[in-house]
């Protein structure tokens, strides 16, 4: 029974296509992320939205500065998602309008720049984003534009495997082991947030195993009766009863969803449920052992949009858009076929915290 997260245990969708190799995040500006908001501020209201560009700073560090130096109570600071430290990122924050005069203090926070500010009627909430645009440099690649484009074309046709990335599993990928102990014993040291996060790591490992099993069974881009499927255009979920829905899955209009086991999530039926049970049985786990968690369903794949590859003297630039909750590393591992990139440190994004 191996509960340690190891990226090599998960198959590539593009196994038959060569990777380009190379390195990422040699410099922070090699990894650029732009948050795409679910909505823009209206220009009126009691909440001030701030578009910040940061480099070499975690989102948490910015939150703490707004709290400690600007004086905003932490519960009144809004953020849609967390962004990596070793990257150049643009994201929105919100604070109450009454703190507007203190924003000049942001000039004292090295690595952070205020790009825009506007008013809105509500606080920015976790998950209030469409997704993220990425602009990533692969340095010293062995392959070229043609190899990268072949992989991205396949991913655009079939969808990007929605594996959880290394951010979810902690140093050495050991958090699922700690989460398993909490599930089995029902107690342990640490704050409630830490316990939720550790059990969330176990939920995520089980989900990744489910994705890999569906691939092995030839059901990655299929749905079967009993599946809960997600409509990519609207986000709605429904129970698959008509075998004819398989055609919509092949067109990437819908995708099967996998479980983040808990007490409040739609449960699969029939063959689809049996696949989930097989993953649980590997570790001697039962559904009822996750009743302390909320639970959710997560699509097996996500659409890839706005993708492009450009050659530069320093390497290959990849540009693409992914929906919220998905991981750029899941795409990069397909393009590069280099597992070492999955061990990069990054910050877990709260929009990925469904089911905790």
UniProtKB/Swiss-Prot annotation:
One of its GO terms (cellular component) is cytosol. Gene3D superfamilies: TruD, catalytic domain, TruD, insertion domain. It catalyses: uridine(13) in tRNA = pseudouridine(13) in tRNA. The active site is at residue 84. Its EC number is 5.4.99.27. Keywords: Isomerase, tRNA processing. The keyword tRNA processing applies. It is an enzyme of class 5 (isomerase). One of its GO terms (biological process) is tRNA pseudouridine synthesis. It holds the Pfam family TruD. InterPro entries: PsdUridine_synth_cat_dom_sf, PsdUridine_synth_TruD, PsdUridine_synth_TruD_insert, TruD_catalytic, TruD_insert_sf, TruD_pseudoU_synthase. PROSITE patterns: TRUD (PS50984). GO terms for molecular function: RNA binding; tRNA pseudouridine(13) synthase activity. Residues 159-302 form the TRUD domain. Belongs to the pseudouridine synthase TruD family. Responsible for synthesis of pseudouridine from uracil-13 in transfer RNAs. This is tRNA pseudouridine synthase D. It comes from Thermus thermophilus (strain ATCC 27634 / DSM 579 / HB8).
């Amino acid at each position: 029974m191996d509960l340690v997260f190891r990226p090599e245990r998960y198959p590539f969708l593009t196994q038959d296509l060569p990777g380009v190799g190379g390195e990422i995040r040699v410099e922070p500006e090699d990894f650029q992320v732009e948050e795409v908001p679910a909505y823009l501020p209206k220009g009126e209201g009691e909440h001030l939205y701030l578009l910040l560009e940061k480099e070499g700073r975690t989102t948490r560090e910015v939150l703490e500065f707004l709290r400690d130096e600007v004086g905003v109570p932490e519960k009144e600071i809004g953020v849609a998602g967390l962004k990596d430290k070793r990257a150049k990122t643009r994201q929105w924050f919100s604070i109450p309008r009454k703190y507007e005069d203190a924003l000049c203090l942001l000039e004292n926070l090295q690595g952070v720049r205020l790009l825009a500010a506007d008013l809105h009627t509500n606080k920015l909430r976790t998950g209030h984003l469409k997704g993220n645009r990425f602009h990533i440099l692969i340095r010293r690649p062995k392959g070229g534009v043609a190899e990268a484009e072949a992989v991205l074309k396949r991913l655009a046709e079939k969808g990007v495997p929605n594996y959880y990335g290394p951010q979810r599993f902690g140093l050495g990928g050991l958090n699922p082991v700690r989460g398993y102990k909490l599930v089995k014993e029902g107690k342990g040291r640490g704050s409630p947030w830490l316990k939720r996060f550790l059990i969330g790591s176990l939920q995520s490992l089980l989900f990744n195993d489910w994705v890999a099993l569906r691939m092995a069974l030839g059901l990655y881009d299929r749905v079967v009766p009993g599946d809960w499927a997600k409509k990519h255009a609207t986000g709605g979920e429904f129970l698959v009863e008509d075998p004819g829905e398989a055609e919509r899955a092949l067109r990437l209009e819908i995708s099967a969803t996998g479980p983040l086991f808990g007490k409040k999530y739609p449960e699969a039926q029939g063959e689809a449920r049996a696949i989930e049970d097989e993953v649980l049985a590997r570790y001697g786990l039962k559904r009822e052992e996750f009743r302390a968690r909320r639970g959710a369903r997560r699509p097996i794949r996500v659409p890839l949009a706005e993708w492009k590859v450009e050659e530069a003297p320093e390497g290959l630039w990849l540009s693409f858009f992914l929906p919220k909750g998905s991981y750029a590393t899941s795409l990069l591992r397909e393009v590069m076929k280099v597992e070492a990139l999955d061990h990069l440190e990054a910050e877990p994004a709260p929009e990925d915290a469904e089911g905790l």
